[in-house]
Every structure is written in C-alpha cells, then in structure tokens.
Swiss-Prot record:
Subcellular location: Endoplasmic reticulum membrane
EC number per UniProt: 1.14.14.18
UniProt name for this protein: Heme oxygenase 1
InterPro entries: Haem_Oase, Haem_Oase-like, Haem_Oase-like_multi-hlx, Haem_oxygenase_CS
Superkingdom classification of source: Eukaryota
Chain intervals for the UniProt region annotation (Disordered): 1-24, 239-261
Predominant subcellular localization, coarse grouping: endoplasmic reticulum
Catalytic activity: heme b + 3 reduced [NADPH--hemoprotein reductase] + 3 O2 = biliverdin IXalpha + CO + Fe(2+) + 3 oxidized [NADPH--hemoprotein reductase] + 3 H2O + H(+)
Compositional bias of kind Polar residues: 1-12
Entry binding sites for heme b: 19, 26, 135, 184
Source organism phylogeny: Eukaryota, Metazoa, Chordata, Craniata, Vertebrata
Bilayer-spanning residue ranges: 267-289
C-alpha cells in the first residue's frame, strides 16, 4: 500500500512557508506611496523623523513582549537580544532627530498605536504569534533595511559616521547573510501543530498589513502638511522672490557702452541653467535606451 505523498506546493520549513504566505502583502507594502518615495530617494527629513518615531514605539512594544516570553519554548530559540534588539539604537536616533527631550517630542500616531496594541495583545495572550512579528521586522531590517539606510544617508545628507541611523546598524552581527540563515534554521526547529502554524502564517500577513496602514497614514500626514504650507499661500515668499528678480533686472546703460547680460551678472544662474541642460540630456538618453 502506497503512503500518501505530502503536498509539494506547501513548504515544509516554517521560514519558507512564511516567505510564501507573505509574498503578496510584502509587495503591497513595498508599493505603498511612502515606501516608493523612500526607495526613490524622495525623502524629507520630516517624513524620516515620523517613520523613525513610529519604529521606536513599535520596537519598544515588540521587545517588551519578547522579554516577557523569552523563556517560553514557543519563542526561546529566536531570542537574540544582543544581535537584534533595536530599542537602544532607536533611542540614540530619537535623541539625534528630536533633541535631548525627545521623549516629550516624538509623535505617536493612530496607526502606530494599533500596531503596538496588537503586539501587546499577542505577547500576553498568544505568544507563539510573536514569531511572525519578529520574522517580519528583524529579517526585514537585515535585508532591505540596509538599502534604505544608504538611501536615507544620501537623501538627507547625513554624515558617513552614521549619526541618526543607528537603527540600521547591527554591530554584533558580522555577516547578515549567515545570521539570517541561522535565524531561519532556528525557526524551522519550532514545534507547533498545523493549526498553530497556520495562525503564525496569518499573523505574519497581519504584521505586513499593519505596516501598510502605517505607511498610508504617514503619507497622508505629510501630504496634508504640504498643503497647509503651500508656498502659493505665502505672500512674503512672493515678495522676496520679486525683489530678487528686480535685483537681476538690467540697469540703464551708459551711452556707448554695451549692457552686460543677466547671465554675465549672475554666475549662479548661469551654472543652474547649464546643469538643467545636462540633466535633461541624461534623462532623454536613459529614456531612449
């Protein structure tokens, strides 16, 4: 009598099953407007401060629940506080971005609160689901997070020494690739029933959806603030701009002497026009390719 063959479409390892189960929501998170702008380097200091403050609240909640359950066999194999925990690093970043009284200054948005509440609920009532949240956060930080660090450093003109970006640095991990392999292998040793395993997979999707809601909220806040500070509503800016144009206007020339052009009197303007021409040329060339 032949034994029934296992369903080859369902990954046997938990790490692979998580990757497969979250593929669609992972793509949705990457395509959120906030993240698309981030990936393109269209990042403002205000937007970066907002997302970093949200991450601070999220990681405080996550790591408090991890500490609560560090001796619980449903999580113990994944307990790597020295290598992974982000709270101390985020506290450094909060001080950099918000100043010495940062605890009184950082925002706490509604989507962030919902994320925190879910982490607290899981840690206290269903600690086995912490695996899903640790997977989505820490492995993401060790992967795409390193790319985002470089983008933020360039877009915000941050020092190469890493101030303001401690969150993205893992000084106790020599090789991110090897550590991720170790972490996944530990995940695959966790013993759980098929029912618990499915709940872990579902919770990983929930974690991504919480991130998507956060990105949408942050983008909405930035968009609203941009509208509130529309330069078209700032007459003082128009007055100053008008005065600069007046300064560049040609003066009455002496008889018999040619009047210098605006460009010859304004080397900065001449440089900007030249640079604009070069950028347009490069853009057209790339489009043609």
């Amino acid at each position: 009598m032949e034994r029934p063959q296992p369903d080859s479409s369902m990954p046997q390892d938990l790490s692979e099953a998580l990757k497969e189960a979250t593929k669609e929501v992972h793509t949705q998170a990457e395509n959120a407007e906030f993240m698309k702008n981030f990936q393109k380097g269209e990042l403002t200091q205000e937007g970066f401060k907002l997302v970093m403050a949200s991450l601070y609240h999220i990681y405080v909640a996550l790591e408090e629940e991890i500490e609560r359950n560090k001796e619980n066999p449903v999580y113990t194999p994944l307990y790597f506080p020295e290598e992974l925990h982000r709270r101390a690093s985020l506290e450094q970043d909060m001080a950099f971005w918000y100043g010495p009284r940062w605890q009184e200054a950082i925002p706490y948005t509604q989507a962030t609160k919902r994320y925190v509440q879910r982490l607290q609920e899981v840690g206290r009532t269903e600690p086995e689901l912490l695996v899903a949240h640790a997977y989505t956060r820490y492995l993401g930080d060790l992967s795409g997070g390193q790319v985002l660090k470089k983008i933020a450093q360039k877009a915000l003109n941050l020092p190469s020494s890493g101030e303001g970006l401690a969150f993205f640095t893992f000084p106790n991990i020599a090789s991110a690739t090897k550590f991720k392999q170790l972490y996944r292998s530990r995940m695959n040793t966790l013993e759980m029933t098929p029912e618990v395993r499915q709940r872990v997979l579902d919770e990983a999707k929930t974690a991504f959806l919480l991130n998507i809601q956060l990105f949408e909220e942050l983008q909405g806040l930035l968009t609203q603030k941009a509208k509130d500070h529309d330069p078209l509503q700032a007459p003082e800016l128009h007055r100053r701009a008008g005065s600069k144009v007046q300064d560049l206007a040609p003066t009455k020339a002496s008889r018999g002497k040619p009047q210098p052009s605006v460009l010859s009197q304004a080397p900065l303007l001449r440089w900007v026009l030249t640079l604009s021409f070069l950028v347009a040329t490069v853009a057209v060339g790339l489009y043609a390719m």
